[in-house]
Each structure stands twice: as C-alpha cells, then as structure tokens.
UniProtKB/Swiss-Prot annotation:
The keyword Membrane applies. Component of the A-type ATP synthase that produces ATP from ADP in the presence of a proton gradient across the membrane. The B chain is a regulatory subunit. This is A-type ATP synthase subunit B. It comes from the Archaea. Has multiple subunits with at least A(3), B(3), C, D, E, F, H, I and proteolipid K(x). HAMAP family: ATP_synth_B_arch (MF_00310). GO terms for molecular function: ATP binding; proton-transporting ATP synthase activity, rotational mechanism.
Length: 462
C-alpha cells in the first residue's frame, strides 16, 4: 500500500454482522492489515482484515461493532500488520490481551516493534531441544522431563486444578547453570474475573512476577483479542529469548477458549465448518502457535512452551487435544480419579509422555540414574495399578506376596511422588531420591531395569 492509500477514508461499509463488517470498493488491501475505524460519534476503534478479495474486505473489529452503522462509519486501512512494542522492561508487568498495561503502570517504551505473527523460521536453522528445565514438580521433572525448546501440553478437564498447577510451574520453573537468565511469559485467554484476580494475586504475592510477563484476556473481551493474545505473548517470548539471550518458558491457558474464539469468528464469516463445528484450518492455526517454540542456531536463548487446555467432557479424542497431540512433543494428562482422591497435582503418568525426555536426562543434565530408575518406577507403578482391578474382583487375600509389594508400591508412589504441596519445590535430586526410597518396597530381584552398580550407589539399605 502506498502513502496515498494510507490517507484514504472509506465510508462504503455495506454490512455489519456480529464482530465483522464488510467494506466495498477498496483496492490494494492485504490480509492481516490493521484498520483504523471511526464510529458515528467520533470514537476510535481498531480492526484487522480477515479476508480481502476483488474490491471487498472483511474486517474484524477488536472492540465489537456496537454503535457502528453502514452510513456514518469511517474506515482507514493503515498498511501495517498487527505489531507489539517490546522491551526488557516488560518483565514484572501485567498486560491485557492486546498488550495494554493492566497493573496501573505506564505504557512500555518500545525498544522494537515486532509483528505478532513472528517470522518464518528455516527448519535447518533450528537446534534440537536440549537441556533440562526444572519445574519443581516430581511428575514432570522425573517422569515427563521438560527440555529447553520443547512444546508439551497439559490436558486437563473442567474443575481440575490446572490453574493452580500453572501458577506453581510459573513460580518454580528454572534452568540449571551458572549465569543462565530465565523468564516466564504467562498468557491466560477467555478466563473469568475471578480467575484473573487469582492469577494476578498469585504472581504478586509470591514474587514470581519479577521474572514474568503476564497477559490476561477475559471471557467478556472480544473474540479477536483472544486470537491475538497468544501471538503477542509468543512475540514477547521470542524477543526476550533471541534478542536478550534468555531462556523463556511460555505458559498458555486455556487453549480451548482460544479454539472456541476461532470457531466463533469462523461462524460469523459463514465458513464451512469442520469437525464439531471448528474451522478446517484449526490444525494449521494451532501449529502456527506451537511451532514458535524451539532453539535457534547462533542464539543463546530458547523458547519452551506449556500450553494448557481443558478437554470438553474429558474427551481426549476431541479435536482440540487430538490436533494438539499431532503437533506437540508429548502430553501431561490430569486425572479426575486422582483428583477425587485428594491428590495434587493429579498428574496421571501412564497416559502422559514427554517424547524428548531423554534429551534432558542423564549425567551433566540431571543425574546418571535418572532414566533407569524412572523406567523401573514407571513399570512397577503400571503393574500395581493393574493389580487394583484384580483386587476388586478376587480380593487382596488372593494375591501373592510379590503382587502385594507392587500394590503397595503403587499406593506409595501416588502418596509420596505424585502428591506434592502447592508450595513444595522439589529439586530433581530430591525426586530421584524419593523414587529410590520407594523401590525398597519391592523385592531386590524385581529391580530388573536398573544396573547393580546403580543399586549399590543409590538404593537405601534396609
């Protein structure tokens, strides 16, 4: 778009429907372009081009279309895409979903203005995810190890304590190493006012805000803002990682609300729906978010992602968790059964998986026994869980002494490894030591996945 076109104001709004308006008789307009809108009473609003064809543009109005009409509304196309001003001073601040301060502080003086959609990254310029990120939570650090540059979602359900877990991870997460800088970018989408107050209070009172940038989009905010929020958060993370050399953990919650916003906008545009009414491009859209995690050659910093989503009706085959699973490198699954038992965090390690766990385990990263002892504990816990079904049929008296030891191990594993205080920050060494303590419950001859050398070195003597 040339300078002349940027000054043209259009009054040719032909239709307004929901959050969308259609402008006729335009030319030289591009997809994603930002639009300045003047309402009939002179107020200013902002929009974005969602569709441009022939001489028609479909514009999503960020603040909604109330009070707009087809005769007096004025529109000016800016020629720019959606950008955010970023700065190191964003650390310790809370913003709304559009990047405006929510904490009463001043506007950020931008060091750079970056496109919120990021920039295409040549796969050849990526380094494989590597090195351990410690969350202080045993069921993540021990069994589903998080690695710098990885993307691993948390699959939750309505009413499960994923918000509490998200703030605990944000508070406790760290990288191990001298002089390594670490930050958290936290983005909440479509949350209630109560949840917003909870997040802000938790970040402020625990001191976690000092190393964090927080973005909050409320449920009554426009749907298009919900689409922008994770992109703004990821752009901020990329700036801190690749420009400032920091290791950044991005926590996105709740991606289900994000996908509902995608569906709402697609319906307003009369698009042909895909599975369960979601747009057919939802997979591509989610990939545009998740694939912004990683490590880049020649840059010190990394971007690691933990997206959190609530599975509708606890259905892991629902399109949102299903498509997420295709893109990401594993999943951490929260269990309603464990939650009913009063276990926090209710992480079910059997369906959970970190495909890159091996990249962050072992000597020089965690400890030399990590992968072997966790493999042994995982196998023993799985066998103990299976025996519970048998006990429900034949009773515990019918079990052999060996089977009873595995049953006891499964109960102890849930009570001492899975169960953890909301303020309990465990180092990986503490987690592994707890696991070795539990392995004393099993007969020595059943420890087939750990070497005699490791047993002599780490297994406590009875």
């Amino acid at each position: 778009m040339d300078a002349m076109q940027k000054t043209i104001e259009y009054t040719s709004v032909s239709r307004i429907a929901g959050p969308l308006m259609v402008i006729d008789g335009i030319e030289g307009i591009a997809y994603g372009e930002i639009v300045d809108i003047t309402t009939p009473n002179g107020d200013k609003r902002t929009g974005q081009v969602l569709e441009a064809r022939e001489e028609i543009a479909v514009v999503q109005v960020f603040e909604g279309t109330s009070e707009l009409n087809t005769s007096e509304t004025k529109v000016r196309f800016t020629g720019d895409t959606a950008k955010i001003g970023v700065s190191y001073d964003m650390l310790g601040r809370i913003f709304n979903g559009a990047g405006k301060p929510l904490d009463g502080g001043p506007e950020i003086i931008a060091e750079k203005k970056l496109d919120i959609n990021g920039y295409p990254l040549n796969p050849v310029s990526r380094n494989p995810p590597n090195a351990f990120v410690q969350t202080g939570i045993s069921t993540i650090d021990g069994t589903n190890t998080l690695v710098r540059g990885q993307k691993i979602p948390i699959f939750s359900g309505s009413g499960l304590p994923h918000n509490k877990l998200a703030t605990q991870i944000a508070r406790q997460a760290k990288v191990r190493g001298e002089g390594e800088q670490f930050a958290v970018v936290f983005a909440a989408m479509g949350i209630t006012g109560e949840e917003s107050n909870y997040f802000m209070d938790e970040f402020k009172k625990t001191g976690a805000l000092e190393k964090a940038v927080v973005f909050i989009n409320l449920a009554d905010d426009p749907a298009i803002e919900r689409i922008l929020t994770p992109r703004i958060a990821l752009t901020t993370a990329e700036y801190l990682a690749y420009e400032k050399g920091m290791h950044v953990l991005v926590i996105l919650t709740d991606l289900t609300n994000y996908c509902e916003a995608l569906r709402e906008i697609a319906a307003a545009r009369n698009e042909v729906p895909g599975r369960r009414g979601y747009p057919g491009y939802m997979y591509t859209d989610l990939a545009c978010l998740y694939e912004r995690a990683g490590r880049v050659k020649g840059r010190e910093g990394t971007v690691t992602q933990i997206p959190i989503l609530t599975m509708p009706d606890d259905d892991i085959t629902h399109p949102i968790p299903d498509l997420t699973g295709y893109i990401t490198e594993g999943q951490i699954v929260l269990s309603r059964e464990l939650n009913r038992k009063g276990i926090y965090p209710p992480v079910d390690i059997l369906p959970s998986l970190s495909r890159l766990a091996g990249n962050g385990q072992g000597e020089g990263k965690t400890r030399d026994d990590h992968s072997k002892v966790i493999s042994q504990a995982y196998a023993a816990y799985a066998e103990g869980r299976g025996l519970r079904d048998l006990v429900a049929v034949v009773g515990e008296e019918a079990l052999t002494e060996r089977d009873r030891s595995f049953l006891k191990f499964a109960d102890a594993f849930e009570n001492s490894i899975v169960t953890q205080g909301v303020d309990e920050d465990r180092s990986i060494e503490e987690t592994l030591d707890y696991v070795w303590d539990l392995l004393t419950i099993l007969p020595r001859e059943e420890l087939k996945r750990v070497s005699d050398e490791l047993i002599e070195k780490y297994l406590p003597k009875k």
